[in-house]
Amino acid sequence: MKLFAGNSNRVLAESVAQYLNIPLGKASVRRFADQEIFVEIQENVRGEDVFVLQSTSYPANDHLMELLIMIDAFRRSSARRITAVLPYFGYARQDRKPGPRTPISAKLVANLITEAGASRVLTLDLHAGQIQGFFDIPTDNLYAVPVIARDVKANYATGNCMVVSPDVGGVVRARSLAKRIDAQLAIVDKRRERPGESEVMNVIGDVSGKDCLLFDDIVDSGGTLCNAAEALLNKGANSVTAYITHGVLSGGAVARIASSKLKELVITDSIQPTTAINDAPNIRVLSISDLIGEAIARTAAEESVSSLFD
């Protein structure tokens, strides 16, 4: 087994390598003057079980091309099996046609990864579960909920917690956390007027006096979370914390979160945190390196991955 990484999240890759007690593989990923990407694998991988870790986060297109070119390089170097490890799967929000004459880009990206030569895929908290079916190769969708549940139990009196889904579509995800910490569930019903903006309409459930835990897969602009936090506090919530797997946090999201009524935003390192995120007073980062590392170890040993979440 050998683990390699592109440039998108080397800090996480190094932590995963440390968990696995193996060195991070030697590979050069660089750009020519015209910004074409060039990859050189700097050690023998013939007959090896290769894992390449790369989040296709901002800049999504560059990081996706890095991944595809790395997979091609491993295939042409006679690797026995190539597993693409995507802690964050970019383009996942384009999983259906929102209107006429529009693409399903998540399916296209799945096709590209497969055609490049990947044998299987490991990813984390896909935006929509059906994206697993976009791949024609084995695909394991991991869940951050065990990591998040441990953090909640370490920092909150769970008897007073209420897990809140920020929209109706996230109810199943929120329920999984609520079951693990034995908490009740509430829902924020919202109407999205335009991309990046949302209007909170109603809170379904009695949150009065509760420490509310918003749980979702992606935070991008932060508008939904900030509006949801305000709505919950207006309904009498004691405090509002958000637990989100993927901290995209584009544009002015960090400043928006910092000035919001959220007690804290807790994200994972599926996307490498920026300096602004690390310096933000009310944003905290949980590492999913042990979860990713254990999934890689079990995949390499042909053991069950799903039992991680039993």
Swiss-Prot record:
Compartments, as annotated in UniProt: Cytoplasm
Record EC number: 2.7.6.1
Cellular component terms (Gene Ontology): cytoplasm; ribose phosphate diphosphokinase complex
Keywords: ATP-binding, Cytoplasm, Kinase, Magnesium, Metal-binding, Nucleotide biosynthesis, Nucleotide-binding, Transferase
Binding-site residues for ATP, renumbered to this chain: 34-36, 93-94
Residues forming coiled coils: none
Binding site for Mg(2+) 2: 167
SMART domains per record: Pribosyltran_N
Pfam family of the protein (one): Pribosyl_synth
GO molecular function, one term: kinase activity
Top-level EC class as recorded in UniProt: transferase
Binding-site residues, D-ribose 5-phosphate: 192, 216, 220-224
GO annotation, biological process: 5-phosphoribose 1-diphosphate biosynthetic process; purine nucleotide biosynthetic process; ribonucleoside monophosphate biosynthetic process
Recorded metabolic or biological pathway in which this protein acts: Metabolic intermediate biosynthesis; 5-phospho-alpha-D-ribose 1-diphosphate biosynthesis; 5-phospho-alpha-D-ribose 1-diphosphate from D-ribose 5-phosphate (route I): step 1/1
Active-site residues, as the UniProt record annotates them: 190
Manner of cofactor binding, per the entry note: Binds 2 Mg(2+) ions per subunit.
Catalysed reaction equations from the record: D-ribose 5-phosphate + ATP = 5-phospho-alpha-D-ribose 1-diphosphate + AMP + H(+)
Cofactor: Mg(2+)
Residues holding Mg(2+) 1: 127
Family: Belongs to the ribose-phosphate pyrophosphokinase family. Class I subfamily.
Described purpose of this protein according to its UniProt entry: Involved in the biosynthesis of the central metabolite phospho-alpha-D-ribosyl-1-pyrophosphate (PRPP) via the transfer of pyrophosphoryl group from ATP to 1-hydroxyl of ribose-5-phosphate (Rib-5-P).
Subunit structure, as described in the record: Homohexamer.
Protein name: Ribose-phosphate pyrophosphokinase
Provenance organism: Brucella melitensis biotype 1 (strain ATCC 23456 / CCUG 17765 / NCTC 10094 / 16M)
